Amino acid sequence: MSTKRVLCKFFMHGACLKGEYCEFSHDWNDQPNNVCTFYQKGSCSYGSRCRYDHVKVSRNPTVAPPPSSSTTTRASSSLQPLSFGRPHHVGYQADSSNPRQQISMDVLAHSGSKPVWRNDFQHESVLEDGIDWSISPTVQNQTTLSPADLPICSFAAGGNCPYGEECPQMHGDLCTTCGKMCLHPYRPDEREEHTKLCEKNHKRLESLKRSQEIECSVCLDRVLSKPTAAERKFGLLSECDHPFCISCIRNWRNNSPTSGMDVNSALRACPICRKLSYYVIPSVLWYFSKEEKLEIIDNYKAKLKSIDCKYFDFGTGTCPFGSSCFYKHAYRDGRLEEVILRHLDADDGSTVIAKNIRLSDFLSRLHL
């Protein structure tokens, strides 16, 4: 069969980029070929969600000789689409072994007032001649398909379908967050997943818009208007709510302390309110509530927890941060480091957590 008489599978889903130059047909009256080639090989990863037909196609092992002009005429007459004997009320005979094709043809032939894709996915049980086709189990099995297995129209999901109510593809429901018709009517899990993801992206976009006006408390520039991408980040302090750009707060904390200067009170404290913060969290967003700040900090720690610590070095090195390190302490066999804290009781009754104690620390304090 010529490719010009085979309906383009990309055109069926509204995604053909070749237009009039496509070698396949863009006429809905032509026969489609929606057999999944991956299913024939037994390796379709989409399963029931695949938009193509999962049917076994029998192959003739013998190779036919090149057809002549006379045999071509006989072959074309013998390759007419099959029908299972239903009355020709549609005006097109579809392949009975292709249930999705039967659905598409009936959807195209429907001329009711409601949208075509809103019709049921079965033929009418009683036709004009009074024959009840619903009593035939063979016909019913061949024409019944779960609506959840059908894809939605990509044109409608993108915002505008040129076919409107006459579109042969199913139209999705409206997502109130993104404003697109992209919610599948018969896939509740997929709808819920899209809604959560869409709300999360919308919330992030709103936070990004509000963060555009935040200025650094040191250089007084808008943080997200810095010239380079590396500078367009906030440096969040764990115990303070003053905004800083990441470069300014890091330069402040990396200054070498003078003799006799307390590092905690001089460098690790906020330049404005002097509150002590032991670490800085880089972020492209600024928070506007305590919950948002905790979410940013938790996401940052979770990301670092998946990165191996360069000081621990899979157990061959020593991390100076100990149990306070945000990075992963794991051995080469995948085992995580078992943290055992040593508690020391002081004379005043307080308890402190001891770090690694070495003999050289005591010997260095002796004046012999």
From Swiss-Prot:
Translocase in keyword set: no
Keywords of the record: DNA-binding, Metal-binding, Repeat, Transferase, Ubl conjugation pathway, Zinc, Zinc-finger
Enzymatic class: transferase
Keyword set includes Metal-binding: yes
Involved pathway(s): Protein modification; protein ubiquitination
Species this chain originates from: Oryza sativa subsp. japonica
Protein name: E3 ubiquitin-protein ligase makorin
Chain intervals with Low complexity compositional bias: 69-78
Functional note: E3 ubiquitin ligase catalyzing the covalent attachment of ubiquitin moieties onto substrate proteins.
